[in-house]
């Protein structure tokens, strides 16, 4: 590897002071900055100028380089360059004439659904904030023809020296461009993007479950410099249901039946998740707390549907008139209950037997 003459690249003598080296670097970096210079080889020259300054601006690196330059030892020079390669790689980044397009950021939101909406699918309107290209300047950051002035922070070099190693980094003021746009767009303050309140209708597929993430491509933040937009991610959260409790793909519910139906048996109608009614036959002597499983009426999940498990509760009348009281007293006698003279106590006991 031939030894480069970094003093010659910067146009300074080998005994130049640190201030002279810095001054030469700023002048050349400004002249050959890829965003300013019309020279077709500006990027390579700018890269070489930064490499030279990186080595000569540090006292220890300059001392080692001077030793190698004096001896002409190309092997030592190659080892020296490999040693500082990590530093140089960070300099080469971002020195292209046209920065790469940058994909927009993703937007992540919580989507609350009822059990019915998630089970059978629906359409939901989503409101959220996202960054889009400024409609005033069409994402350029300026209106009309660009008017630019030299960045005062880096003096047009696009780089600023910072850190204990005097390492040149992209200027944070001008973002490494070496200039500042004078006629910035007033609508976006030169950013080229503005926040917009968006309204989007999304399709929720049937069988959506708690924790599922729905992806809407291209509905995140708009990209920069022509980059593609980010995506919108919606994490599903199921609202508590007043009737059904979901456990996996099964649904659980409680159904209240009358005392005569529990004793005599018969059919009752159960409202399903769809909103339709399903007839259920009860055997005579159905006890409070007994369950019945209806296959295929649970929650729809990919590959099948769960079951509906019903727990029956016996509904006890709260307002007992004289006719009902007489019937219960007669029932108590038939069942062999003692202490009929304590009518209130017996009635209370019978009613308590019907409860949980």
From Swiss-Prot:
Subcellular location(s) of the protein: Cytoplasm
GO molecular-function terms, A-Z: ATP binding; heat shock protein binding; unfolded protein binding; zinc ion binding
Gene3D superfamilies assigned to the protein according to its UniProt record, in alphabetical order: 6.20.20.10, DnaJ domain (1.10.287.110), Urease metallochaperone UreE, N-terminal domain (2.60.260.20)
Residue ranges covered by zinc fingers (CR-type): 121-197
Comment on protein domains: The J domain is necessary and sufficient to stimulate DnaK ATPase activity. Zinc center 1 plays an important role in the autonomous, DnaK-independent chaperone activity of DnaJ. Zinc center 2 is essential for interaction with DnaK and for DnaJ activity.
Quaternary organization: Homodimer.
PANTHER family recorded: DNAJ HOMOLOG 1, MITOCHONDRIAL-RELATED
Descriptive protein name: Chaperone protein DnaJ
Organism this protein belongs to: Hydrogenobacter thermophilus (strain DSM 6534 / IAM 12695 / TK-6)
